[in-house]
Amino acid sequence: MHTTESKDEHLEDENFQTSTTPQSLIDPNSTAHEETKTVISDTEEIKPQTKKKTYISCPLRGALNRIITNGVILFVIWCTTWSVLGSEALPGGNLFGLLIIFCSAIIGGKILQLIRIPLVPPLPPLLGMLLAGFTIRNVPFISKHVHVHNTWSSILRSTALTVILIRAGLGLDPQALRHLKVVCFRLAVGPCLMEASAAAVFSHFIMKFPWEWAFLLGFVLGAVSPAIVVPSMMVLQENGYGVEEGIPSLLMAASSMDDVLAITGFNTCLSIVFSSGGIVNNAIASIKSVSISLLAGIVLGFFVRYFPSEDQKKLALERGFLILTMCVSAVLGSQRIGLHGTGGLFTLVLSFIAGTKWSQEKMKVQKIITNVWDIFQPLLFGLVGAEVSVSLLESNTIGIFVATLSLALCVRILVTYILMCFAGFSFKEKIFIALAWMPKATVQAVLGPLVLETARVSAPHLEPYSKDVMTVAFLAILITAPNGALLMGILGPKLLRRHYDPSKIKLQLST
């Protein structure tokens, strides 16, 4: 009896403790709550006083481990190429030059990403890649040992152009194109054509270019750079700036169409410039090359739609490899047989038609092509920077080039503002769109050197004009890429309205 009574009393004590403890925690007026509150506040006050110990782990981990690993991988790759190819991998060889330019461009891009200026958005990495190649070319000791033959650089730049065209073709959404309002079409077509025409007129009278070369330069400058516009618009879109008016979506959708138009015009002018016949014969040859590229692109585009079939393993990888090899072969092959510009239009048509049937698998193929672009991007901008030599530039020539470029940009900005006047945007929004439609980078980095390489192979007597086109393209990237990124990052939050409620976001591309 005594034991049972003690057990009952013990159980009652436990029940009493468990019943009172939650009540004291729930009741904010209870003394227990105040005690626990003071204990928590004391611990919170003590926490900042604790010092974290910094130490280096053994073996190394993190960023330092990754840097050492990548360095060893690059060294092993160089050792392998040297053991197979010998002098090509030594200083002065092509592979050695490509490896130095590739690594320097990556380092230049990373350094530019690390530079942070208060209240200023980060600069695009491609600018660091461009400056890295420019530094390699213009430092005497380095330039003696880093050399890439023109044939090698031409093939790499043409391959980079192919990757850009594939991305542009796959990026064209047929549903969006079908339902696009007039404002998007105006933004994609109007500024590009007007800037190309303005640059042609200014270069003809200021730079003394023939008219065919003037329009060739105009279409080189007429393209906007999605590599600058799209990341900046995505940042603004994530923060809610201009989303209800559809400004980020408008600029991202129109950028691909703008590039397609500029590249098509460039290919047509390139065929005319480097053909040996008269004006009528050149026009007929251009129509033939366009017809051939369209027909071949449509036929092979439908082929790639269904081959490989959807039941194949690694479907996205096979599709990406097939479309990449087809398009690279077309671009390089058309240059080999003298049909300049045919491969570019073929690539656009093939990738667009093939992508319309791939539905969900299209995103996977785009990811594969993006990974390929990540490899060719530092090579492209590094090689473009390495083509520009300060010793060959004259101060008055640079002034003429900058004047031509600046006047063409002013025309583009003015035309963009005028075309947006009847689209339902406010004054500040029209100013932002006009300034955001200015940056140039990827297309100019490909088309400028392509003119130079074509002249070296087909018409050496036209090389002075091609060097001028190359220099203007370099200056266009150097001036507009960082300034455009900075203007979008700084003026976006100031000129665009911010919307916090995602349910109220509507895409309004009014006519």
Swiss-Prot record:
GO BP terms, alphabetized: flagellated sperm motility; proton transmembrane transport; regulation of intracellular pH; single fertilization; sodium ion transport
Any single Gene Ontology cellular-component annotation: sperm principal piece
Ranges of Polar residues composition bias in the record: 16-31
Ranges of Basic and acidic residues composition bias in the record: 1-10
TM stretches of this protein: 67-87, 95-115, 116-136, 152-172, 187-207, 215-235, 260-280, 284-304, 337-357, 368-388, 398-418, 431-451, 472-492
Membrane topology classification: Multi-pass membrane protein
Subcellular location: Cell projection, Cilium, Flagellum membrane
Organism domain of life: Eukaryota
Region (Disordered): 1-41
Protein's UniProt keywords contain Transmembrane helix: yes
One Gene Ontology MF term: antiporter activity
Entry keywords, A to Z: Antiport, Cell membrane, Cell projection, Cilium, Fertilization, Flagellum, Ion transport, Membrane, Sodium, Sodium transport, Transmembrane, Transmembrane helix, Transport
Function as written in the Swiss-Prot or TrEMBL entry: Sperm-specific Na(+)/H(+) exchanger involved in intracellular pH regulation of spermatozoa. Involved in sperm motility and fertility.
Family note: Belongs to the monovalent cation:proton antiporter 1 (CPA1) transporter (TC 2.A.36) family.
Protein name as annotated: Sodium/hydrogen exchanger 9B1
Organism, as annotated: Macaca fascicularis (Crab-eating macaque)
Record gene name: SLC9B1
